[in-house]
């Protein structure tokens, strides 16, 4: 059953059109009429019986079919009767023909489904009371709806040995119904061939053949698509039932993609994180870091204000004392003697509040941890630092050139889009930078940034590929811009993009230039006028420094004067907190309603799922309280008022789920002429080369035991983190 779909995936042929609606043939211009239980519906030729039924709102039961995966047709649960046909047909795989009358609830259809369900349940264990899939199990629901009320099976049930495929996905393979969704997901979406089947008939098993870790940054998604309890979450095992939890729609901040998520909580604790559908960003997938790093929200948290005593030790204190100390110091300095550094997990509301606070003392010394060139157009033009084509726009591109980036681990969901387009749309991919293990074939052009200048001048062989491109896309990794020649690299890419526009038939509305960011706060910070990088602080060390969630280690105590007063405000005791003279505990992304802007410039909101631990408070509220004690009260008291202020400074920050048009590429190219354009020959090396570098990149994931287990499993093998099962 699997050979044809997997073969298609491996050779890059498509058995589905672009997007997520799939047909099995070429769509003609004329619609054809079919009938579903006597109801007329017009569909395109090649539409399957199942799709035609869904068009009129008729749900057909299925286990193996998934709208984003190839058709396997091996569970047979979707059998329906076609009027005047001798036998029932598999609705997921059979294309409709003109005039067909599909009978979804005939006696023949019901009997067929009942028979299939009986065979599925024959070997399925009665684990429902102890199965983590209970309450959201397709087999439970469909056996109730379409199965028989009694069993005729009296023999012994078969049992299958469980597989250890790592610290994230728990396997109880006796429950497996061989739908092969996990195999097709791994091969087609994740781009790894770790999963497969062995044996046949009653002896068929799904697994890795040789016991090893399921090595993918998207592996947790097999938990969602598994229709039974064969694949479940190891960290979530035996902790809660779905009906006990409260679901809060939010967004992820582990990278700059802004994946939509659902945070499940119980009694003030995050129990698990699931994906939420958003066609333009993450479809219905999320990365493993997004899904499993939530246990880091419970560890190494800052729960009370702290001050450094005479002995140099940090001790707990009250909010009044901590804020009074900070306010007293703030009143002693003004101008650029006061500075601030914003970290990667900071929300836009806190960024604008801190900006207003420092502006009140005549300081504009506001920096981000991430470096971005400010020469030429720099950050003055928004199109200069965004993924202008958008994430979904990758599906329209015909050529993608990756420069100094590894999207597989920097932005896994963006990488999944590239693979989807490569698989289905014959996308050509090339890479300039260190060779990395991507999930699709690519042409490695070399690792020197000088290749950019060769392409711009027309001397490189890749120019022939670009000449034929109608919708080329250049993706420049933000880490490539953090080198000493970052500005020259940005100019080289900008010049190359303009040359592509001149020499090819690229439409004026198509955006070629794209920057792929790695951290969630960077775009909002640049929108609000923060200076990228901390070089200005190193050159002119301040007397007072605010570290707002700054845990990247971009500045150390040795870079600052001994008498510099440091205030750390954040939610984890990570890199920044030990440097501080005063610590102000803030709220994590699951504990506040906050605005984040993703790499394509799309503003989105997190929602309050749980309350902050201990005495921790939302960041903008802490800054507002500090301003009042310091006698420079900020002009807002509520979240709505803060967002009104956001709109004054940068209106796009409150246009939620909307992308503003960016078209200032010609102006950026002209300003680039003012920049030193000499690039170094040093190779472009992305910071996240392997999957080991993917798991622990911020204060939350570094505090996560699950992420630490993943790193150990990758380096030492899945057996190194194997835990005894109680089930």
UniProtKB/Swiss-Prot annotation:
Subcellular location(s): the record lists:
Mitochondrion inner membrane
Q: In which tissues is it expressed?
A: Brain. More abundant in neurons than in astrocytes (at protein level).
CDD domains, from UniProt?
A: fer2, MopB_Res-Cmplx1_Nad11
**PTM field:** Acetylation of Lys-84 is observed in liver mitochondria from fasted mice but not from fed mice.
**Where do the 4Fe-4S His(Cys)3-ligated-type domain residues begin and end?**
108-147
Q: Give the record's GO biological process terms.
A: aerobic respiration; mitochondrial electron transport, NADH to ubiquinone; mitochondrial respiratory chain complex I assembly; proton motive force-driven mitochondrial ATP synthesis
Cofactors required: [2Fe-2S] cluster; [4Fe-4S] cluster
Q: What is its EC number?
A: 7.1.1.2
Which reactions fall under this protein's catalytic activity?
a ubiquinone + NADH + 5 H(+)(in) = a ubiquinol + NAD(+) + 4 H(+)(out)
Lineage: superkingdom: Eukaryota
Relay the cofactor remark from the entry.
Answer: Binds 1 [2Fe-2S] cluster per subunit. Binds 2 [4Fe-4S] clusters per subunit.
Query: What are the cysteine partners in each disulfide bond?
Result: none
Q: Where is the transit peptide?
A: 1-23
Query: DNA-binding as a keyword?
Result: no
Please report the stretch or stretches of sequence annotated as the 2Fe-2S ferredoxin-type domain: 30-108
Q: Where do the annotations place [4Fe-4S] cluster 1 binding?
A: 124, 128, 131, 137
Q: Name one GO cellular component term.
A: myelin sheath
InterPro entries in the record, alphabetically? Answer: 2Fe-2S_ferredoxin-like_sf, 2Fe-2S_ferredoxin-type, Mopterin_OxRdtase, Mopterin_OxRdtase_4Fe-4S_dom, NADH_UbQ_OxRdtase_75kDa_su_CS, NADH_UbQ_OxRdtase_ferredoxin, NADH_UbQ_OxRdtase_Gsu, NADH_UbQ_OxRdtase_Gsu_4Fe4S-bd
Which residues make up the binding site for [4Fe-4S] cluster 2? 176, 179, 182, 226
Role of this protein: Core subunit of the mitochondrial membrane respiratory chain NADH dehydrogenase (Complex I) which catalyzes electron transfer from NADH through the respiratory chain, using ubiquinone as an electron acceptor. Essential for catalysing the entry and efficient transfer of electrons within complex I. Plays a key role in the assembly and stability of complex I and participates in the association of complex I with ubiquinol-cytochrome reductase complex (Complex III) to form supercomplexes.
SUBUNIT field: Core subunit of respiratory chain NADH dehydrogenase (Complex I) which is composed of 45 different subunits. This is the largest subunit of complex I and it is a component of the iron-sulfur (IP) fragment of the enzyme. Complex I associates with ubiquinol-cytochrome reductase complex (Complex III) to form supercomplexes. In astrocytes, less complex I is assembled into supercomplexes as compared to neurons. Interacts with MDM2. Interacts with AKAP1.
Descriptive protein name: NADH-ubiquinone oxidoreductase 75 kDa subunit, mitochondrial
Gene that produces this protein: Ndufs1
């Amino acid at each position: 059953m699997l050979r044809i779909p997997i073969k298609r995936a491996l050779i890059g042929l498509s058995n589905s059109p672009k997007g997520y609606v799939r047909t099995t043939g070429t769509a003609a211009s004329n619609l054809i009429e079919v009938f579903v239980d006597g109801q007329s519906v017009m569909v395109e030729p090649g539409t399957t019986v199942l799709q035609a039924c869904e068009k009129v709102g008729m749900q057909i039961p299925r286990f193996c079919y998934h709208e984003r995966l190839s058709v396997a047709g091996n569970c047979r649960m979707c059998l329906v009767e076609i009027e005047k046909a001798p036998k029932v047909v598999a609705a997921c795989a059979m294309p409709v023909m003109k005039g067909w009358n599909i009978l979804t609830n005939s006696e023949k259809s019901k009997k067929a489904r009942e028979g299939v369900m009986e065979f599925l349940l024959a070997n399925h264990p009665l684990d429902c009371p102890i199965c983590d899939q209970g309450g959201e199990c397709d087999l439970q629901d469909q056996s109730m709806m379409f199965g028989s009320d009694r069993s005729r099976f009296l023999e012994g049930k078969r049992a299958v040995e469980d597989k250890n495929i790592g610290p994230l996905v728990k396997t109880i393979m006796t429950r497996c119904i061989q739908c092969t969704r996990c195999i097709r997901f791994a091969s087609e979406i994740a781009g790894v061939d770790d999963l497969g089947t062995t044996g046949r008939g009653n002896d068929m098993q799904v697994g890795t053949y040789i016991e090893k870790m399921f090595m993918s940054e998207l592996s947790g998604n097999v938990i969602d698509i598994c229709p039974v309890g064969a694949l479940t979450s190891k960290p979530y095992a035996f902790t809660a039932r779905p009906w006990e939890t409260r679901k809060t729609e939010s967004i992820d901040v582990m990278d700059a993609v802004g994946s939509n998520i659902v945070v499940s909580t119980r009694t003030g604790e995050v129990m698990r994180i699931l994906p939420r559908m958003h066609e333009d960003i993450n479809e219905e997938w999320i990365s493993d870091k997004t899904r499993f790093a939530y246990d880091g929200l419970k560890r190494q948290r800052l729960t009370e204000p702290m001050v450094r005593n005479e002995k140099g030790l940090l001790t707990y204190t009250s909010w009044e004392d901590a804020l009074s100390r900070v306010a007293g110091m703030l009143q002693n300095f003004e101008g650029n003697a006061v500075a601030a550094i914003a970290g990667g997990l900071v929300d836009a509301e806190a960024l604008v509040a801190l900006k207003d606070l420092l502006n009140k003392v005549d300081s504009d010394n506001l920096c981000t941890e991430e470096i971005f060139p400010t020469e030429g157009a720099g950050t003055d033009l928004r199109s200069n630092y965004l993924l202008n084509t958008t994430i979904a726009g990758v599906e329209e591109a015909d050529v993608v050139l990756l420069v100094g980036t590894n999207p597989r681990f920097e932005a896994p969901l963006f990488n999944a889009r590239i693979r989807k387009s490569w698989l289905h749309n014959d996308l050509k991919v090339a890479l300039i930078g260190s060779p990395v293990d991507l999930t699709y074939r690519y042409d490695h052009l070399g690792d020197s940034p000088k290749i950019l200048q060769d392409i711009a001048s027309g001397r490189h062989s890749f120019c022939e590929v670009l000449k034929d491109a109608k919708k080329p896309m250049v993706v420049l990794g933000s880490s490539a811009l953090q080198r000493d020649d970052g500005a020259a690299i940005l100019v080289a890419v900008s010049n190359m993009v303009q040359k592509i526009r001149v020499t090819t038939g690229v439409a004026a509305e198509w955006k070629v230039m794209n920057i792929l960011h790695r951290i969630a706060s960077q775009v909002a910070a640049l929108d609000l006028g923060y200076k990228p990088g901390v070089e200005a602080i190193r050159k002119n060390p301040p007397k007072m420094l605010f570290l707002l969630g700054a845990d990247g280690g971009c500045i150390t105590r040795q870079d600052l004067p001994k008498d510099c007063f440091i205030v750390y405000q954040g939610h984890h005791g990570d890199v920044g907190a030990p440097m501080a003279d005063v610590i102000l505990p803030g709220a994590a992304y699951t504990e506040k309603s906050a605005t984040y802007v993703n790499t394509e410039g799309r503003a989105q909101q997190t929602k309050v799922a749980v309350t902050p631990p201990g005495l921790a408070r939302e960041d903008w509220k802490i800054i507002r309280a500090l301003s009042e004690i310091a006698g420079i009260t900020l002009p807002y008291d509520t979240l709505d008022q803060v967002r009104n202020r956001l709109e004054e400074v940068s209106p796009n920050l409150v246009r939620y789920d909307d992308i503003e048009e960016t078209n200032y590429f010609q102006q950026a190219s002209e300003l680039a002429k003012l920049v030193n354009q000499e690039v170094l020959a040093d190779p472009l090396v992305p910071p996240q080369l392997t999957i080991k570098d993917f798991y622990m990149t911020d204060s939350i994931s570094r505090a996560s035991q699950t992420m630490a287990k993943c790193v150990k499993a990758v380096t030492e093998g899945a057996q190194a983190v194997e835990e005894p099962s109680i089930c």
